[in-house]
């Protein structure tokens, strides 16, 4: 049955085609508990920087039905199969079809480190290269004690914490690039990328906390995310100027961010961090965060002669 699968590019401006594409991802979220497409992938597909692919099968009973969805381009590949159609070989067939037109090295995420993704990766020449820990906090508190700690942390060593202001864009992007110089996604954000996120329905300037030194320079930030109707809040991105280390700024920002999420009515907080960032892992563990899930990034490297590389 898997050989009846077809790959095509849906028109996301068409309501029916867009619904079919995103319905596959929604079905996976309902079963797996996490989104198969991260935020950057969704922004890229809506902006046209990457291409959506829908995998459909044809049957006499249902005619053409979307059973898989992928987002490809810019050296990245994301693929998900509707849980109702897993275990039938569709994932392998879809991946072969996507790889047939791919050029150069590819990276792919397995959100939640799904066992089936490990098998597909192994069979198609992908090797694990990164692990992101998804951590979850204990119950958040807006109590006087917690608020007092965070407020005290807002004013130490000449550093103050306040919301993002209009005009901070260029300085923030420059600092973000330095903080995440070796980070494949976060470090390459542009002012346009920043503004695209600020245009999202969940954005509030008061959730974007900026640490400034006594001269008004940005030395760190904690951008928290409180999506409408969500119980969990998120430490969306937290960073401290590499030239401003060891002064407790990161901890102060994190406490202020957790306080802000509690003010927004969120009962817990989540965060994604690199598994090999031992100092960040230690800080979050000290503040009661525990591991919830793991995301694994795979890479498929192609040598100059077109053969797979295993190093």
What feature does the model see in each segment?
Residues 1, 73-78, 83-158, 296-300:
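Acyl-donor-binding surface of acyltransferase catalytic domains
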Residues 1-43, 149-187, 309-311:
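Short amphipathic alpha-helix that is part of the acyltransferase structural core
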Residues 36-53, 70-75, 185-240:
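A conserved beta-strand-loop-helix scaffold within acyl/acetyltransferase catalytic domains
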Residues 62-68, 216-220, 279:
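Glycine-rich acetyl-CoA-binding "A-motif" of GNAT/NAT acetyltransferases
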Residues 81, 238-240, 273:
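Hydrophobic adenine-recognition pocket in adenosine-nucleotide-binding enzymes
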Residues 87-101, 237-240, 246-263, 281-286:
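Conserved acetyl-CoA-binding loop-helix of GNAT-fold acetyltransferases
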Residues 124-146, 255-311:
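Active-site/acyl-donor-binding loops of N-acyltransferases
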């Amino acid at each position: 049955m898997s050989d009846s699968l077809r790959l095509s590019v849906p028109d996301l401006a068409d309501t029916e085609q867009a619904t079919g594409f995103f319905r596959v991802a929604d079905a996976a979220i309902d079963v797996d508990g996490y989104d198969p497409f991260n935020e950057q992938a969704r922004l890229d597909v809506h902006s046209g920087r990457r291409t959506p692919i829908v995998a459909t099968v044809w049957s006499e009973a249902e005619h053409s039905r979307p059973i898989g969805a992928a987002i490809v381009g810019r050296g990245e590949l994301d693929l998900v199969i509707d849980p109702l159609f897993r275990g039938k070989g569709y994932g392998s067939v879809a991946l072969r079809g996507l790889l047939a037109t791919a050029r150069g090295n590819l990276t792919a995420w397995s959100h939640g480190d799904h066992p089936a993704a490990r098998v597909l990766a192994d069979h198609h020449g992908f090797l694990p290269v990164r692990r992101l820990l998804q951590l979850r906090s204990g119950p958040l508190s807006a109590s006087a004690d917690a608020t007092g700690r965070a407020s005290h942390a807002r004013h130490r060593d000449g550093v103050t914490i306040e919301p993002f202001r209009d005009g901070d864009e260029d300085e923030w992007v420059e600092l973000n690039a330095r903080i995440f110089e070796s980070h494949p996604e976060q470090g390459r954000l542009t002012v346009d990328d920043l503004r695209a996120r600020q245009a999202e329905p969940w954005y509030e300037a008061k959730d974007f906390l900026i640490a400034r030194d006594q001269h008004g320079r940005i030395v760190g930030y904690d951008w928290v995310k409180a999506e409408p109707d969500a119980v969990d809040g998120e430490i969306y991105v937290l960073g401290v100027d590499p030239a401003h280390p060891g002064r407790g700024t990161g901890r102060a920002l994190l406490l202020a961010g957790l306080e802000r999420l509690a003010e927004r009515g969120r009962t817990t907080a989540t965060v994604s961090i690199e598994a090999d960032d031992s100092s960040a892992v230690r800080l979050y563990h000290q503040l009661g965060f525990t591991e919830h899930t793991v995301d694994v990034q795979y890479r498929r490297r192609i040598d100059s002669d077109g053969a797979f590389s295993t190093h």
